[in-house]
Amino acid sequence: MIRNGTGWCEMRVQTTIEIFDYWNRIRGAADAPLKSQVEPSAVPHLLQSLFILEAREDGDIVFRLAGTRICDLFGRDLRGERFSSLWAHGQHGDIERTAIGVMDHAMPALFNTTGYSIVGHQASFEIIMMPLRSSNGACDRVLGAIAPVAAASWLEIVPLEFLALDRSRLLPEKFSKVAPAELRPINEIVAAKSIGFGQAMRRVVSQLLSAEAR
């Protein structure tokens, strides 16, 4: 784990650490900041690695904005494209449900992924997803970042074909103060058929708070 400005976290990439710290600062005591509070001039060195997702009326989660480095990683402009289109086919449903959960429950999520190129290269990435609110109070956007764990000479030259999810976990509000020993993976939560997503999220948070109390 790495100590950042808001506490202990499992993030290991400077880009995701910095944007999470920024998001945490501007939200203050709220569960999520207003999208109008996000000032590009405050994080100019991160812009190329940032993205914003939105939910369309048909339920699709799409890129509203994608930084130049992200577009270069995949060899195309991602604006308007479904977020799930970047992922391995068997993971589309889990990825979309996680993005919706970040907005519905105003709770950030952290992914560890492996990206595979069209010629067989692979690289590890860290992805952070954080909720944003509109002026009407609705939590209807996701601010995120995609960053490689280590530099690779072929990145941004040979396009990625898809991402594969290796691990995912929630970053509840208390996470900025104390890091529990283990966070239940999101893909386990969304796969649970016997309980709703909201109930599962509340159960996870309850477990985390109990761990902190001990």
Residue ranges and their predicted role:
Residues 2-166:
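Sensory/regulatory domains in signal-transduction proteins
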Residues 2-7, 150-214:
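Regulatory/sensor and coupling segments of signal-transduction and defense proteins
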